[in-house]
């Protein structure tokens, strides 16, 4: 009977070689895995915009118009005020009933104004997953600051639901020619249920600020204050006009809990009325280059605060996603031609998309 062959052990050099090979394989595979995950997140983001587009078109089929931008940034959606001029909430609230979020839309329905103010606290703290880009943050409430709310009590800790998507406010500047056509906190609480009574609703000059003439002159997008836009008003064609797209957000604010006014327009609830938290613009071909630079779509980063309240952008590399007024979803390059992008924001400029 022969003696057994001695088992040969790994040498230290061989072990180090194996570890090095494994390290190289991980280094090669990890970027591919990360890229695949980001591609999946970006695709999910596109699906969210598809849902928003379809919900908006379903609302249009039901009511005859797109959702209005609401009354102002201190008002949230009211379940007893329909979806037209009488609705103080913004586009995000208007489409809830068509996004499998009917329960959130109906919070406080039929209650007295005082009881409803308490009930709507729940609405403000109820995120809709489709309003969040998974490349940026999960669907959860985050700090919004101690803001005044006209028709609702603030949630505990001032933690609101947010939105990563913004309606198309147009290719005009929010404030032009010195006219007061920018943002408003909206009318006083007395307006609820009494719109458009001048005695009840002209607080903060609301009715004088957002007249039909001023809307037609200064607001050429598809989501505007007070007045819902009809598809027939989109004279440039629904396939040539942005409905909603990803908004730029400084990455410092993804989950920051200590900011107040320094928020780059991410400090109000998703369902509030017209505000640059939920509206952005395409004025990238403005005559003044400094003004135009504010509106250039930009990838999220932790340094760009200039123009952060008015520009579109995303957490994706190279592109941001947008849904058009026909419900289609497109990925738009950050290198998009300035004139072309500006035209995509106007509902009736008559210009041909290059």
Where are these regions (language model features)?
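Internal low-complexity, small-residue/proline-rich segments
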Residues: 35-354
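N-terminal single-pass transmembrane signal-anchor helix
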Residues: 7-41, 51
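N-terminal leader/signal peptides at the extreme start of proteins
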Residues: 1-12, 73-76
């Amino acid at each position: 009977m022969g003696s057994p062959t001695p088992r040969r052990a790994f040498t230290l050099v061989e072990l180090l070689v194996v570890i090095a090979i494994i390290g190289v394989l991980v280094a090669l595979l990890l970027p591919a895995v990360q890229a695949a995950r980001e591609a999946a997140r970006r695709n999910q983001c596109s699906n969210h915009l598809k849902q928003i587009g379809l919900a908006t078109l379903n609302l249009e089929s039901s009511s005859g118009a797109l959702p209005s931008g609401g009354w102002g940034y201190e008002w949230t959606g009211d379940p007893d005020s329909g979806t037209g001029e009488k609705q103080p909430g913004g586009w995000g609230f208007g489409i809830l009933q068509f996004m499998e979020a009917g329960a959130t839309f109906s919070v406080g329905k039929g209650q007295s104004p005082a009881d409803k103010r308490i009930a709507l606290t729940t609405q403000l703290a109820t995120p809709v997953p489709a309003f969040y880009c998974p490349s940026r943050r999960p669907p959860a409430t985050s700090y919004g600051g101690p803001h005044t709310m006209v028709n609702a009590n603030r949630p505990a800790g001032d933690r609101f639901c947010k939105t990563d998507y913004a309606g198309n406010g147009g290719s005009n500047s929010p404030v032009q020619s010195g006219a007061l056509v920018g943002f408003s906190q909206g009318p006083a609480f007395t307006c609820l249920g009494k719109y458009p009574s001048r005695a009840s609703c002209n607080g903060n000059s609301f009715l004088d600020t957002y007249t039909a003439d001023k809307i037609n002159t200064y607001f050429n997008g598809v989501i505007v204050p007070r007045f819902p836009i009809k598809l027939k008003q989109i004279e440039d064609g629904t396939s040539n006009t942005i409905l909603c797209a990803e908004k730029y957000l400084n990455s410092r604010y993804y989950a920051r809990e200590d900011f107040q006014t320094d928020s780059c327009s991410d400090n109000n609830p998703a369902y509030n009325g017209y505000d640059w938290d939920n509206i952005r613009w395409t004025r990238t071909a403005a005559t003044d280059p400094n003004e135009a630079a504010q509106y250039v779509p930009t990838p999220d980063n932790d340094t760009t605060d200039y123009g952060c309240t008015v520009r579109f952008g995303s957490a994706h590399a190279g592109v941001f996603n947008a849904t058009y007024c026909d419900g289609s979803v497109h990925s738009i390059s950050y290198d998009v031609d300035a004139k072309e992008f500006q035209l995509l924001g106007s509902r009736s400029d008559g210009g041909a998309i290059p």
